Design a protein with these regions (language model features):
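C-terminal motif of bacterial Sec signal peptides marking the signal peptidase cleavage site
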Residues: 26-27
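Generic helix N-cap/helix-start motif at coil->alpha-helix transitions
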Residues: 36-40, 61-70, 81-82, 95-105, ...
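Alpha-helical adaptor scaffolds
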Residues: 74-78, 91, 103-108, 256-267, ...
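Structural motif corresponding to the intra-repeat A-B loop/turn of tetratricopeptide repeats
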Residues: 80, 109, 113, 144-146, ...
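Catalytic glycan-binding domains that act on GlcNAc-containing polysaccharides
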Residues: 238-246, 274, 333, 338, ...
Length: 623
């Protein structure tokens, strides 16, 4: 794409012509116009102010696209330590998400090699906002930064360790609390990071290979907490009981927490609670606490739930999930005032699932009235002139022309880079710009980042409304639910393709499309058109609901994970929010909560009556 063509497309977008020709869309799709964005009258009286005058330098679209085509080779060169080649590329490229990614890969290679001098030089060139945890760990390990909080986070985390963060921990192992250090060894063993665990144990003075002492005990514990052992928790629990006498209380207490969590993830909540009762809470990770709480929640053991949340690390207690459920636990025990205080805290965490539920517990409902005006054409054009924004849009439009999904993902990364330090008025202007270009996923992304200035028309866009409403009516499903699902599935990207092959706006698998096509008299290739994708997706939503006791929550889980799994996760009849929170797959658990939250916001925007999330979640029937 030439610069002149790109600027022409930009100008026509500013003039309100949003039907940019996109090769990957069908002819039908090209005729579909997004619904016009109309701020609420009250907001329209308040002109947008405070939009930043960004002036980052621009490159030509050809230079931007050429850099993209060199990106993979430069990334590989950085990972392999081709210092001169990487340095030459970075010296000729403007700062971008691409250059930050390449520099980050180079820094990790330098860290692995122990080249402190060159690491220091390159680290200084990486902005604070672009530094990931591993590069920060290397910087702290090399003494470039003093970061005691980072060291503590690495020590306390239940996550797998990166090489940089392992180096930081290894270099400081003599100065940390020994009990917490041995706990970290256990966490590594439970995650099968045995080499790291072995190195740490040796640094602590008791190698795992010893025949006695702490290291030998940890190695013995490993046999019942490894990922393989977690797959057979019953047999592993028997072995742990047999060896408990030769372990310390902390070692056995950690082991019980690991196996209890394995039971909980397998939906065996009563067995999980029995093992959690033997666990040492000081040894539990946040993941263990989460499943301990979910196990208590599933059985409505409110007093236990209250106690478990109170035992969590402070960061866990502050999470909206546990603010809300502790409020519910306190309310169930008659502590109304304390519950209300926690609901107020949860309600202030944004517009997430638990913020909405907490708002309703306080006797209120969500509002989708905008408090910010639509950005003016001049303000939007001002944003478009910024070099970083220009780069993202150049890659976006070229990706459409070339049907290059990988390039589109990089365009998304460049948009995140371009907007990461924008203030709220600028974010809303950027969201409008992205919307004008039909870069829908990044319009939503930008609008979602504001906390005070709110434009719900940009947060919850409704493109292709005629098609969505037509097929929603035809298949008897709620259009707000359909929009909520599309927003989560694809962010309205017609060419979206998942890692497992799901396609289009509604992320329908090709095999599923063939089955649907046979049942309703379609050509399965219509999956790749907008009309066909929405028709198939809405039919599948209706089918999932009918197969899952006409329940939207079950159908949403089934749409993501399959009807069989959604059915397996049922027990006796329970509150929909409890069902959602105890789904064992983190992706599906998050998906259900987001789709259902989206649905109530769309219902409000579309002036439908069902705007209560608690009512929409309802009761999930028993199997």
């Amino acid at each position: 794409m030439t610069l002149e063509l790109f600027m022409y497309l930009t100008r026509i977008a500013f003039n309100g012509i949003t039907g940019i020709a996109v090769a990957i869309l069908s002819a039908c799709a090209a005729q579909q116009k997004p619904v016009e964005l109309k701020p609420e009258p009250a907001a329209a009286q308040q002109p947008m102010t405070g939009v930043q005058a960004l002036q980052r330098p621009s490159e030509t679209p050809d230079k931007i696209v050429n850099d993209f085509y060199r990106f993979d080779s430069m990334q590989a060169a950085a990972k392999n330590g081709a210092d001169a080649q990487v340095a030459q590329f970075l010296s000729t490229a403007q700062p971008s998400a691409m250059t930050e990614s390449i520099r980050t890969a180079w820094l990790k290679n330098l860290g692995t090699r122990g080249d402190v001098a060159q690491f220091r030089q390159q680290y200084a060139l990486l902005p604070e906002a672009g530094r990931d945890p591993e590069t920060k760990c290397y910087a702290a390990a090399f003494g470039i930064e003093q970061n005691s909080r980072l060291l503590n986070d690495v020590l306390e985390s239940g996550d797998k360790l990166s090489a940089g963060c392992f180096l930081l921990l290894q270099k400081n192992i003599g100065s940390v609390n020994q009990s917490r250090a041995w706990r970290r060894v256990r966490i590594l063993l439970a995650a099968d990071q045995v080499a790291y665990a072995r190195t740490l144990a040796a640094a602590l003075g008791s190698p795992l290979e010893n025949t006695d002492g702490a290291g030998a005990q940890e190695n013995q514990l490993r046999s019942v907490i490894s990922t393989a052992a977690q797959k057979t928790p019953q047999a592993s629990a028997v072995r742990l009981q047999q060896m408990a006498g030769s372990l310390t209380g902390e070692q056995a207490g950690f082991g019980w927490g690991v196996l209890a969590t394995a039971y909980a993830k397998d939906q065996q909540f009563d067995q999980a609670l029995a093992l959690y009762a033997q666990a040492d809470r000081s040894q539990l990770t946040q993941e263990h606490f989460d499943w301990f709480a979910r196990s208590a929640l599933r059985g409505k053991h409110w007093q236990t739930l209250d106690s478990v949340i109170a035992s969590m690390p402070e960061s866990g207690q502050r999470d909206a999930t546990w603010l809300y459920w502790r409020g519910r636990a306190l309310a169930a025990q008659g502590h109304s005032a304390e519950a209300q205080a926690l609901y107020r805290q949860a309600a202030q965490t944004g517009r997430n699932f638990y913020a909405v539920l907490a708002t309703e517990e306080l006797g209120q409902r969500i509002s989708t009235q905008n408090n910010a005006a639509q950005a003016s054409a001049a303000q939007v054009e001002q944003i478009s002139k910024d070099g970083a924004v220009h780069r993202a849009l150049s890659l976006f439009h070229t990706s459409l022309q070339n049907q290059d999904w990988k390039m589109r993902r990089q365009a998304q990364n460049e948009w995140r880079y371009a907007t990461r330090e924008m203030n709220e008025p600028t974010l809303l202007a950027a969201a409008q710009l992205a919307y004008n270009h039909q870069f829908y996923e990044m319009a939503i992304y930008s609008a979602d980042k504001t906390n005070h200035l709110l434009n719900y028309n940009l947060r919850y866009i409704t493109p292709y409304r005629d098609l969505v409403q037509t097929y929603s009516r035809q298949h008897g499903v709620d259009a707000a639910w359909v929009y909520g699902l599309i927003r989560q599935e694809s962010r309205f990207v017609m060419g979206a393709q998942s890692s497992v092959g799901a396609q289009g706006l509604m992320q329908v698998m090709p095999a599923t499309a063939r089955e649907i096509a046979r049942k309703i008299g379609m050509d399965s290739q219509q999956l790749y058109t907008m009309d066909g994708n929405i028709r198939m997706g809405t039919w599948y939503m209706a089918d999932a609901r009918s197969r899952l006791q006409n329940n939207e929550v079950l159908a949403t889980a089934g749409y993501n994970a399959g009807p069989g799994r959604a059915r397996k996760w049922q027990g006796s009849a329970m509150e929909g929010a409890i069902y959602a929170e105890t789904i064992p797959f983190s992706e599906t658990r998050d998906y259900v909560k987001k789709v259902m939250t989206n649905a109530v916001y769309y219902a409000s925007i579309m002036q439908q009556p069902n705007t209560s999330l608690k009512q929409r979640m309802g009761t999930v029937p028993g199997r």
